[in-house]
Amino acid sequence: MSDSIDTFTRQDMAPSGPRTFDRRNPLTGEVASSAPAHDAADAREVADAAAAAFPGWSALGPNPRRALLNKAAAALEARANAFVEAMMNETGSTEGWARFNLMLAAGMVREAGALTTQIGGEVIPSDKPGCLAMALREPVGVILGIAPWNAPIILGVRAIAVPLACGNTVILKASETCPRTHSLIVEAFAEAGFPEGVVNVVSNAPRLPVNTTVAMCLLP
């Protein structure tokens, strides 16, 4: 079965040109999914979208962020059959391993949601009498998460959940081995109501991973 993936952010942004690549089922050789082959220009575009979304997302309070993360966990679970089918077809995994991935990943998102109210600072001793010195933790900006294929749902979620809880926007660099599985994660977060540009995914053909990934890593 082939699933076609048309997006690399939640806003239905397509690659700059009709470029796609096929991922084949390692057990049967059949096409498992067809995904966008994004290049360096596409990577810069999605990074710009994530940067534009950062001020609004970082200003959102911890309780609204927690509520959205809890909704995302439920959205992941609601897509169980799609996740299992995609992971089995793209990676050749067993059904049990795919379902375990999903169960653990949903729990990780809920744990990340619980962290939103636990992000604190500290009081730092000062040599100046009457001076109160504090260190505060603040979101840093756009976070790039590069997820592998061997536990794709778990590791894809791990790459983005805590950064989101801390007020950062994220780009998930999907593995070329399981682009559909990783894209489903972002679709679930979009369904949960995350604002435009906060959660993004980029995929690339196996022949282009260095160009696309390096382009994202070099962005300011």
Regions found by a protein language model. Name each.
Residues G121-P220:
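Rossmann-like NAD(P) dinucleotide-binding subdomain of oxidoreductase/dehydrogenase enzymes
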Residues M1-C131:
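N-terminal Rossmann-like NAD(P)+-binding subdomain of aldehyde/semialdehyde dehydrogenases
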